[in-house]
From Swiss-Prot:
Cellular localization per UniProt: Secreted
Pfam families noted in UniProt: ESP
InterPro entries associated with the record: Esp1/Esp22
Transmembrane domains' residue ranges: none
Gene Ontology biological process: negative regulation of male mating behavior
Lineage: Eukaryota, Metazoa, Chordata, Craniata, Vertebrata
Record's protein name: Exocrine gland-secreted peptide 22
Tissue and organ distribution: Expressed in acinar cells of the lacrimal gland from where it is secreted into tears. Not detected in a range of other tissues tested including other exocrine glands, internal organs and sensory epithelia.
Main location: secreted
Family the entry assigns: Belongs to the exocrine gland-secreted peptide family.
Gene Ontology MF terms in the entry: pheromone activity
Keywords, sorted A to Z: Behavior, Pheromone, Secreted, Signal
Organism: Mus musculus (Mouse)
Signal peptide: 1-24
Length: 111
């Protein structure tokens, strides 16, 4: 019952690893040095990309629930929250947990 969410999470981790494979520095290259301002800009840019990606997750949750009737909505919600936990601060997740649960439950009941 929990195998599909775990499989989806594993696939997303593997894809991220494959995309970054082979991008290490060679011996002749020097590591770039970022100032604190650049690091904060990079962090905000990455958070923006993650937010854009996570906006599509509820649609994926609905699609999975339509395809597989064995998966309970709570399993889908816990998978989505795990994805959020990986991407954001735990404090931000705790604040938005109720909103996320209500939104996904509403979307699942409308299907």
């Amino acid at each position: 019952m929990n195998s599909v969410p775990v499989m989806l999470f594993s696939i997303s981790i593997l894809l991220a690893a494959m995309l970054t494979e082979g991008r290490g520095l060679t011996q002749t290259q020097k590591e770039s040095i970022f100032s604190a301002e650049h690091k904060s800009d990079l962090k905000s840019y990455l958070e923006m990309l993650v937010c854009r990606r996570l906006r599509d997750v509820p649609e994926s949750v609905i699609h999975i629930s339509k395809v597989s009737k064995e998966i309970l909505p709570d399993d889908l919600l816990s998978t989505y929250l795990l994805e959020l936990l990986v991407c954001f601060d735990k404090d931000k997740l705790v604040q938005s947990k109720g909103i996320v649960f209500n939104t996904i439950k509403r979307l699942l009941t409308n299907t």
